[in-house]
Amino acid sequence: MDPLRAQQLAAELEVEMMADMYNRMTSACHRKCVPPHYKEAELSKGESVCLDRCVSKYLDIHERMGKKLTELSMQDEELMKRAQQSSGPV
């Protein structure tokens, strides 16, 4: 696969993953913070605060997980390089 096509696929996958994360966050926070039977057309103060906190926590955890996965991936790459260097030419 040529590098340009690989880059396009990676970008498409990233957009798809972000859309999925947004949809899951929206659904989870809506279920948690907004009752199924609306009493008013507008969000109440409590609902609004709940949604704000829920989204904030969701994004914070998403960022932390991304950093940890990047860290683990870099460690794996380093271990692979060391293993290749120690095995030497075959």
UniProtKB/Swiss-Prot annotation:
<dbReference type="GO" id="GO:0045039">
    <property type="term" value="P:protein insertion into mitochondrial inner membrane"/>
</dbReference>
<feature type="disulfide bond">
    <location>
        <begin position="33"/>
        <end position="50"/>
    </location>
</feature>
<comment type="function">
    <text>Mitochondrial intermembrane chaperone that participates in the import and insertion of multi-pass transmembrane proteins into the mitochondrial inner membrane. May also be required for the transfer of beta-barrel precursors from the TOM complex to the sorting and assembly machinery (SAM complex) of the outer membrane. Acts as a chaperone-like protein that protects the hydrophobic precursors from aggregation and guide them through the mitochondrial intermembrane space.</text>
</comment>
<protein>
    <recommendedName>
        <fullName>Mitochondrial import inner membrane translocase subunit Tim10</fullName>
    </recommendedName>
</protein>
<feature type="disulfide bond">
    <location>
        <begin position="29"/>
        <end position="54"/>
    </location>
</feature>
<dbReference type="GO" id="GO:0032977">
    <property type="term" value="F:membrane insertase activity"/>
</dbReference>
<comment type="subunit">
    <text>Heterohexamer; composed of 3 copies of TIMM9 and 3 copies of TIMM10/TIM10A, named soluble 70 kDa complex. The complex forms a 6-bladed alpha-propeller structure and associates with the TIMM22 component of the TIM22 complex. Interacts with multi-pass transmembrane proteins in transit. Also forms a complex composed of TIMM9, TIMM10/TIM10A and FXC1/TIM10B.</text>
</comment>
<dbReference type="GO" id="GO:0005743">
    <property type="term" value="C:mitochondrial inner membrane"/>
</dbReference>
<keyword id="KW-0862">Zinc</keyword>
<keyword id="KW-0653">Protein transport</keyword>
<keyword id="KW-0496">Mitochondrion</keyword>
<keyword id="KW-0999">Mitochondrion inner membrane</keyword>
<keyword id="KW-1015">Disulfide bond</keyword>
<dbReference type="InterPro" id="IPR004217">
    <property type="entry name" value="Tim10-like"/>
</dbReference>
<keyword id="KW-0813">Transport</keyword>
<dbReference type="GO" id="GO:0051087">
    <property type="term" value="F:protein-folding chaperone binding"/>
</dbReference>
<keyword id="KW-0811">Translocation</keyword>
<keyword id="KW-0479">Metal-binding</keyword>
<dbReference type="InterPro" id="IPR035427">
    <property type="entry name" value="Tim10-like_dom_sf"/>
</dbReference>
<keyword id="KW-0143">Chaperone</keyword>
<dbReference type="GO" id="GO:0042719">
    <property type="term" value="C:mitochondrial intermembrane space protein transporter complex"/>
</dbReference>
<dbReference type="GO" id="GO:0042803">
    <property type="term" value="F:protein homodimerization activity"/>
</dbReference>
<feature type="short sequence motif" description="Twin CX3C motif">
    <location>
        <begin position="29"/>
        <end position="54"/>
    </location>
</feature>
<keyword id="KW-0472">Membrane</keyword>
<comment type="similarity">
    <text>Belongs to the small Tim family.</text>
</comment>
<dbReference type="Pfam" id="PF02953">
    <property type="entry name" value="zf-Tim10_DDP"/>
</dbReference>
<dbReference type="GO" id="GO:0046872">
    <property type="term" value="F:metal ion binding"/>
</dbReference>
<dbReference type="GO" id="GO:0042721">
    <property type="term" value="C:TIM22 mitochondrial import inner membrane insertion complex"/>
</dbReference>
